[in-house]
Amino acid sequence: MTIPLRFGYKASSEQFGPNELLDFGVLAEEMGFDSVFLSDHLQPWMHDGGHAPNALPWLGALGARTERVIIGTSVLTPTFRYHPGVIAQVFATLGVMYPGRVVLGVGTGEALNEVTLGLEWPEAPERFQRLKEAITIINELWAGERVTYEGTYYSVKDATIYDRPEQKVPIYIGASGPAATRLAGRIAEGYITTSGKDPELYTEKLLPALDDGLSKAGRTRDDVDTLMEVKVSYHPDHDTALEKTRFWAPLALTAEEKMSVHDPIEMQRLANELPIERAASRFIVSTDPDEHVERIARYVDLGFRHLVFHDPGHDQEQFLRMYGEEILPRLRKRFA
């Protein structure tokens, strides 16, 4: 199969409450976006002004208020707060209600969302193995009438998902390193990563790992949706476009700086110490729509087929209208 080129909207659940965020998701469909994704956080990156609506009821509400857009998580962790069997049931239900429109995006998680509940936070190798096992359980529950599974970390006994969609809900794996990227190539229907990092990370590590996983599974890039979350900040005034990124400064922290942080107040303290130039380093910051198009196009040229745009500002309606009217038509014309 050939993967179509799609352009989506990242709904900032760490920045907006559920009702306002829902209106943005509906507007994204009206403005011509192809998909709406959100993360599933128990706590936001920033304490002051932060939000953290749960993704699961929100996706159901968004599906009911839209007709066309793909809806999904980017990403959800099915290994600590949730048992994988519960996630299998939830997304099977969503798949029945909104056939062909639902994506389950999963990742290994962050301490921010797990430790506060008294849950353990193991080292990266165990988190990776937990994710593999969770995906196995979810797929078996979706495929089988009666499932018993005894794994290292999870088990199910005589389990049945009674309401399953005719069309399987695709699983996308979010990854920022080669191991999880390779796993996406081997077993997933989609791969998610984020923009604004060293270009060599994509060309020398991540995409070769994806291709290696695909090759081991006898697949090609045409068999997997490659999704890039593209961080963008547009405003006619450059200083304003730059300052908009301040709320999302935690994205500029390294994995070593933030992975073990479980408190939004501490995360905010670390982020506030960053100069604005570093806070903005993950974003395409520009006052020129043509520059946005040129810099976004580089990710298409790398082979990504699904670009999901995340704007850091508080005026999401302005962003959605500007991107829908100015950027998406230019991108579609360029890659027609």
Swiss-Prot record:
Reaction(s) catalysed by this chain's protein: oxidized coenzyme F420-(gamma-L-Glu)(n) + D-glucose 6-phosphate + H(+) = 6-phospho-D-glucono-1,5-lactone + reduced coenzyme F420-(gamma-L-Glu)(n)
Any one Gene Ontology molecular-function term assigned to this protein's record: oxidoreductase activity, acting on paired donors, with incorporation or reduction of molecular oxygen
Residues that bind coenzyme F420-(gamma-Glu)n: D40, T77, T108, G109, N113, S176, G177, A179, A180
CDD domains: Tetrahydromethanopterin_reductase
Keywords attached to this entry: Carbohydrate metabolism, Oxidoreductase
Cross-referenced InterPro entries: F420-dep_G6P_DH, F420-G6PD/mer, F420_G6P_DH-rel, Luciferase-like_dom, Luciferase-like_sf
Catalytic residue list: H41, E110
GO BP: any one term: carbohydrate metabolic process
SUPFAM superfamilies recorded: Bacterial luciferase-like
Main EC class the enzyme belongs to: oxidoreductase
Superkingdom classification of source: Bacteria
Oxidoreductase keyword on record: yes
Binding of substrate, residues: T194, K197, K258, R282
One Pfam family named in its UniProt record: Bac_luciferase
Record's keyword annotation contains Transmembrane: no
Enzyme Commission (EC) number: 1.1.98.2
Family: Belongs to the F420-dependent glucose-6-phosphate dehydrogenase family.
Free-text function comment from the UniProt entry: Catalyzes the coenzyme F420-dependent oxidation of glucose 6-phosphate (G6P) to 6-phosphogluconolactone.
Subunit text: Homodimer.
PANTHER family xrefs: 5,10-METHYLENETETRAHYDROMETHANOPTERIN REDUCTASE, PTHR43244
Protein name per its UniProtKB record: F420-dependent glucose-6-phosphate dehydrogenase
Organism whose genome encodes this protein: Microbacterium testaceum (strain StLB037)
Gene: fgd
